[in-house]
Amino acid sequence: MHTTALVLFSGGQDSTTCLALALSKYQRVETIAFDYRQRHLVELDARLIVLNEIRARFPQWASKLGEDHLLDLAVLGEVSDTSLTRDTAFKMEQSGLPNTFVPGRNLLFLTLAAAVAYRRDLQVMVTGVCETDFSGYPDCRDDTIKAMQLALSLGMDKRFLIETPLMWIDKAATWALAYELGEKSGTPGGGQALVDLIIEHTHTCYLGDRQHRHAWGYGCGSCPACELRARGYERYCAARTAG
């Protein structure tokens, strides 16, 4: 039976929902993030705020929340010519992929996370990648994650489990999952409390915009990440209203 987990935690909506899920399942949960000189570097500030808010608002989870790890991955920014690591406009490439795709990003993240998990004796890695609302990123595919799980388990001679709780659900369902997890957290009114925390403190916008406040949170409102988050929130609210 697995009792420990390492969550790849960027400070965004998806990884915060994954963190809540891990805290609801496991006895000890640690977090990891990567500074690869991303344009939306504000997410690294957001994640610390989110961690503090979880500790303050959800005491039963706080007792399980362990060490946070931040790794410097500047080399990824140096070898990547994308709109997430360069000041360039968002567009679709001839390959059919958006220029927000950072080649090898999730592969490196998982490899380094596995090395930390190995050292910290953490049995499960949890990541928020998904195929449903994704932008065509090949390193978010279920097949990719399963291949990485096998390669890392063989290469480190340790059986790793990579959980992807959002793999087959869309953004509306991700909002709903956050509400459900909050309701089961032991905190009175925890469902809305977790949704409000995600709205107010998590960061998704590729441009790093924390000036413009929307019903679903902060962001420019026009980048692909903001559009996905906004549409998901609208559908979530509509479903809640419909009952």
Curated annotation (Swiss-Prot):
Associated pathway: Purine metabolism; 7-cyano-7-deazaguanine biosynthesis
The record describes how the cofactor is bound as: Binds 1 zinc ion per subunit.
Keywords noted in UniProt: ATP-binding, Ligase, Metal-binding, Nucleotide-binding, Queuosine biosynthesis, Zinc
Is Phosphoprotein found in the keyword set?
no
Please name the InterPro entries in this protein's record: QueC, Rossmann-like_a/b/a_fold
Give me the residues that bind Zn(2+), please. Answer: 205, 220, 223, 226
Q: Which family does it belong to?
A: Belongs to the QueC family.
Q: What does this protein do?
A: Catalyzes the ATP-dependent conversion of 7-carboxy-7-deazaguanine (CDG) to 7-cyano-7-deazaguanine (preQ(0)).
Its recorded name reads 7-cyano-7-deazaguanine synthase
Species of origin reads: Albidiferax ferrireducens (strain ATCC BAA-621 / DSM 15236 / T118) (Rhodoferax ferrireducens)
Please spell out the taxonomic lineage of the organism that makes this protein: Bacteria, Pseudomonadati, Pseudomonadota, Betaproteobacteria, Burkholderiales
